């Protein structure tokens, strides 16, 4: 999972993620927006979940982050998982609306994002 951090002309941090993980970048850009307290909450949840069967979720305005002890899923809130309503041959997975990655990989991006933001 590759990523890049940039600052736009106004100094706002933007995240770009590799193909298949774009939604994780959107989550940082739309939900985190340099809010390090939110990252603290996510890291605390990851520590609590490690080695357990529980899961944790944080719904935002545009995206929801879901996590268990092994995996992180970020999905657009407009994406509905209504299996009975799916048309035959249609797949709910849309790389513009859903990304999955391992918890450790995600936490590496969180730590790198925090470092980048604090470099002001």
UniProtKB/Swiss-Prot annotation:
Pfam families: UPF0231 (PF06062). InterPro entries: UPF0231. NCBIfam families: PRK05248.1-1 (NF003574), PRK05248.1-3 (NF003576). Belongs to the UPF0231 family. This is UPF0231 protein YacL. The gene is yacL.
């Amino acid at each position: 999972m590759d990523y890049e951090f940039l600052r736009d002309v106004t100094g706002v941090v933007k995240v770009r993620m590799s193909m298949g993980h774009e939604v994780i970048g959107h989550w940082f850009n739309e939900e985190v927006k340099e809010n390090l307290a939110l990252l603290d909450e996510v890291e605390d949840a990851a520590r609590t979940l490690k080695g357990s069967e529980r899961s944790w979720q944080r719904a935002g305005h545009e995206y929801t982050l879901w996590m268990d002890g092994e995996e992180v899923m970020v999905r657009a809130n407009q994406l509905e998982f209504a299996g009975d309503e799916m048309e035959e041959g249609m797949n709910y997975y849309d790389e513009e609306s859903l990304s999955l990655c391992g918890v450790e990989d995600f936490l590496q991006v969180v730590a790198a994002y925090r470092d980048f933001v604090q470099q002001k």
